[in-house]
UniProtKB/Swiss-Prot annotation:
Family: Belongs to the catalase family.
Catalytic residues, chain numbering: 65, 138
Binding site for heme: 348
Keywords from the named record: Glyoxysome, Heme, Hydrogen peroxide, Iron, Metal-binding, Oxidoreductase, Peroxidase, Peroxisome
Gene: CAT2
Cofactor(s) needed by this chain: heme
UniProt name for this protein: Catalase isozyme 2
Amino acid sequence: MDPSKYRPSSAYDTPFLTTNAGGPVYNNVSSLTVGPRGPVLLEDYYLIEKLATFDREKIPERVVHARGASAKGFFEVTHDISHLTCADFLRAPGAQTPVICRFSTVVHERGSPESIRDIRGFAVKFYTREGNFDLVGNNVPVFFNRDAKSFPDTIRALKPNPKSHIQENWRILDFFSFLPESLHTFAFFYDDVCLPTDYRHMEGFGVHAYQLINKEGKAHYVKFHWKPTCGVKSMSEEEAIRVGGTNHSHATKDLYDSIAAGNYPEWKLFIQTMDPEDVDKFDFDPLDVTKTWPEDLLPLIPVGRLVLNRNIDNFFAENEQLAFNPGHIVPGIYYSEDKLLQTRIFAYADTQRHRIGPNYMQLPVNAPKCGHHNNHRDGAMNMTHRDEEVDYLPSRFDPCRPAEQYPIPACVLNGRRTNCVIPKENNFKQAGERYRSWESDRQDRYITKWVESLSDPRVTHEIRSIWISYLSQADKSCGQKVASRLTVKPTM
């Protein structure tokens, strides 16, 4: 018998109830007891199996991005960028690749309202002919900290108080007062974009710089941008409260219902590219994840379109067990030296092994759709049928060989081991430029959010003064307006 033919699937459902082992179950209502009143007998195997399965049917939720929704579709190349990359899925206009996307909030639990102020996750898994490419981003182009040593503390500060389980402004502002580079992300976090109307009406960003490599081996740094064809829409604070009180899953419902109705969400993919020789020509470090690249100097280049035209079949299998990893790249795309990206390559795979298990890549939603082969073996819940006699390489009895080498960036590294910050921090300029780009009513909403947060009674005078200093260094009038509404004298 083919051991993989009857792999558990609803396609092989019987017309009657069975145990996990396939034995028939004739009573699904009454436990087996001594007489009509009990006690219950341990030999009621199906009862024990049913309860034990129920006790274990949930897996640990994601430590971040726990609340989310997924959908399937395709990515289609619309513009030729083969001069920039040898990635097969970007080979020519018209090339299509199946994808699955997951949108999420970042901080709160799996059942939390989707209307809360938060950064949103925007992750895309491309099932290419050369393996999976995971572009794991957010709806804002920057992040709070540039070094992963601060990442666990960043998330803890944003999450609820471990004593009361209440998210509190004083904790957030206390921690980030030590990270002035976070101000640029706060210019998004306290802005309208972190109250998106739904998932369909928000942008997406790869956040980090990656590298594109062409067939000649020439590399360019690249940033990825998703632009929704239906436009960007946000809610006011009042709308968010009303929507959250009406339906805590409003964004999931909107995504699901839109696809079911044939109103398929679509995003255009754009890239910015930079020659590595130009990295030192800017007044900031282009590989600093707290910075954006100026579009007037590095314009957006159109690449393709993302269309979500299929709802997932099972929420647990294709959303909860769906696993992304920035380490999953394909030939023609490579990592940059971005410190946060470098550590995410490890952390994402590690958290999936903890959350789902060591063989999480064997799950259908995570497995590549192309042929693949290695000697990673066994482990808990291994589902792969393997009949090889050789489980090592190299071997004269196994024809498997290393793949042909593909171009990767040529990079000569040399330097002293050190723990230090980057030379060009420039923490406030871009936050100020963003603030000044807004209309006055949008500026006022941003200031109001700062005043509300800094008015937390546990925010000390010292913390308020630090933040007013940061805001003033970004934009003097912004700092003055916040200070005047708090009756605190600005230090700059």
